[in-house]
Amino acid sequence: LWLSGGERRRLEIARTLATNPKYLLLDEPLTGIDPVSIEEIKIIIKKLKQRNIGILITDHNVRETLKIVDKVYIVNEGAIFYEGDPISAVKDEKIKKFYLGSNFQL
């Protein structure tokens, strides 16, 4: 049996939901999958938020992740470098210099 990356992500989330969690940790849920699967995972995450399930996402796909989160934490050398909302994060000059790059836009 072979599953695509997006199918594996959906299966991992479904398997975890069987335990009725209050919180989910999603490690790199948007990495290594095609754009259609990214959109499907984002829809699933939005539905989980509507069910009041807390979600912690760690992902290097910053552009897509910032579109679905309420709060952003950027970690540098093991310490929280930034804490705030996604829109403020994108506008923050220190974050642009350190992490996003000067031309980053959502």
Language model features: what each stretch is:
Residues 1-3, 7:
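Conserved ABC ATPase signature
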Residues 13:
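Hydrophobic anchor residue at the start of the ABC signature
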Residues 20:
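Conserved catalytic motifs of ABC-family nucleotide-binding domains
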Residues 24-28:
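Catalytic Walker B motif of ABC-type/P-loop ATPase nucleotide-binding domains
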Residues 39-51:
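Helical segment within the ABC ATPase nucleotide-binding domain
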